[in-house]
Amino acid sequence: MDAGDASRLGESLDAVSAAFQSRVMELQELVLARNMYPATAIPDLAAVDVSLTAMEAQLQAVRRRLQEEREAFPKAKKLVQQSLKQQRRLQLMLANMPTGMREDVFATPLEHNSSMMFPESLNFSSAVPEVRDHDLKIKEEPTAPPKKGRGPAPRWYISTEELDSLSSYMRGRLTLEKVNIAINEVASYADGNAHLVACPKKKLSEDTWEKALELRDIAARESVKGRHFFLETDIKGPGLKLDTTGKAILTVLRHLGRFQETRIGHHRVFILSKQQ
């Protein structure tokens, strides 16, 4: 609804109010003519007056609401103009962004969010003038190559077919759920060790730093280098413990190739395998 519609609606309400008041006056005259005695006419007139007052209050409320909406039009128009101006600025920034920085931006989830914030229907290409290299030159600074993290530890869950392929004495009372819960736990142990190996000294306590040094020595071994591992001393449940069931699970996982086992120093080291 624009300002013209609001003005016409206000005029219509004024006309309705005038007609309503004229009708009330006619009703008052009819009430006076109908009643022979003033004692009975006064209550009727009082009831009409109350109804009229309520209707006038409602009409005033509608009129105030229309006035508020009419005053809000300039503010809304200004807000739209500012939004369009900001969109043009963002488009100019994007057009002149260094190549390396642009790759970093579009490699993040912000790309999806920006596509939701600025749909194709806005058509920035028609609203923003083309900016050439000689109009606005930005010196591109060399960007450091992204650091390659080791990634999460492999979680190579077993299938029902693999569990059924085991001999009955090896499988025992193990279930698919128990074994896969254990796989998830040993992967979390390996993730924790990888974090300690990569964490700088200033972020670790003295006791934790000693363990981190020990893990770094193990991680530097040729048979372990670049792979996720956990130690026998890391195993502490609840899904995997060093009891009869836990040892049976470790035997099954080793048999199915989920890890390789070796001994480094006084540690029994389990090196996780990636899914083939």
Curated annotation (Swiss-Prot):
Entry annotated with the keyword Coiled coil: yes
Which keywords appear in this protein's UniProt record, sorted alphabetically? Coiled coil
* GO terms, biological process: attachment of mitotic spindle microtubules to kinetochore; cell division; chromosome segregation; mitotic cell cycle; regulation of microtubule polymerization or depolymerization
Among Gene3D superfamilies, the record links this protein to:
Ska1 microtubule binding domain-like
Q: Which residues form a coiled coil?
A: 48-78
- Gene Ontology MF term list: microtubule binding
* GO-annotated cellular components: mitotic spindle; outer kinetochore; spindle microtubule
One matching Pfam family is SKA1
Family according to the record: Belongs to the SKA1 family.
Under what name is this protein listed?
Answer: SKA complex subunit 1 homolog
Q: Which organism is it from?
A: Oryza sativa subsp. japonica (Rice)
